[in-house]
Amino acid sequence: MSEVIKFKKETKKEYVVDNQIRGRSYSSNHAKLLKHMDRLIDLQQGKRPRPVMFHMSPCNPCNLTCSFCCFANRAMKEMLTVEQMKSAIDQFTALGVTGMEFTGGGEPTLHPNLDEIIEYGYNKGLKMGICTNGSKLRKIKNWHMMSWVRLGMYSFDEKKPYEYHLDVFDGLDIEISAAYVWDGAMDTSTNPNITGEWLDDHAKKLATNEYKEENFMKMLAWVEEKKIPCRIAFNAIKDPKIVQQDIETIKVLIGKHEEKHGKLEYAFLSDFNFKGERRNNHCYMHGVKPCVFTDGNVYVCPSAELAPENLYQVNDEFKLCDIEGITDFYNSQVGGADVFRRHHDCSFCKYAYQNELIDDVLMPTKHNEFA
């Protein structure tokens, strides 16, 4: 496992800075996007977009039912074929994409052919990561081909907790991180996994996870003991005022833990991507991190369903093309901002700061000999 960087945390101000630095290493944000200046220059010059990475949702089945699931209205049995996944990999690598992330939909390790796809992507030269709830780690054999794994710290809130079999990573050069989602105010939740009001209730069941202070403290103790960086997030599919309340609750809980055990070294609050209001409806994420979903289509990003109005599912307005049309779609995006820019009015955009950064890159300005 890669060595984890430790930061000094002698003052609250220093801790906040360190928290932000670590957070920007383990999540999508504009600081990371700035590491890909070649992509931004291509967009500025009207060249064909070359996404930095792409997400792939191999399957929709999941062995958990979480209260915060942003795909609660998905078709539960849907999954990509081996041929579809290989075709997407072929086309994106031909476009110059170098990174791939397996994610949900459902729990990616439940796809029966995931090992085959990991090996295929590895042999194509892709750097690959995976977001998993961590309950089926022993099911996968090709962990040595992965660059990183992000474990969902959801066991701690389940009525029947499960074990994270970290021994599968022994001796491997793979970065292990974690993610936790705090979901307060469940009594006002609109998530179908809480209300039972799915668009289609086939194969659906109600959430069983519970949010208690003691569970949260156990989770913090675990990631600190295991020395695993853990981003602590919140359920964003709510009224922004309630989201802010959840953020404040997380801060209080972290404060209680630190009063007893000292400053956290590995867990950190991931609130720097939360932006209450967007500058405009401009969207460029298909040029950064498009998502191949289980229905065989490619979408603008993996997170449009985080906006409450999108009803916990992927919607047609965010569709770019089907898998076989990836190359043709990106070849059609040459010509600058007026060709490439999309307009989506998501009330919550996880990538609002990145979109604003690209907006600024594309903004025409005079006297550019000066800065």
Label the model's feature ranges.
Residues 75-80, 306-311:
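A short local loop/turn or secondary-structure capping micro-motif enriched for an aromatic residue
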Residues 1-76, 93, 287-289, 297, ...:
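N-terminal pre-core extensions flanking Radical SAM catalytic domains
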Residues 2-11, 38-46, 175, 187-307, ...:
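A C-terminal junction/extension of Radical SAM enzymes
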Residues 52-57, 111-113, 117, 121-126, ...:
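Short acidic, glycine/proline-enriched helix-loop-strand junctions
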Residues 71, 79-103, 107-235:
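Radical SAM/AdoMet-radical enzyme domain recognition
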Residues 60-63, 133, 186, 310:
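Asparagine-centered polar/low-complexity signal
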Residues 57, 101, 131-132, 180, ...:
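Short beta-strand segments
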Residues 180, 236, 270-273, 337-341, ...:
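Acidic carboxylate-rich catalytic motifs and surrounding loops in phosphoryl-/glycosyl-chemistry enzymes
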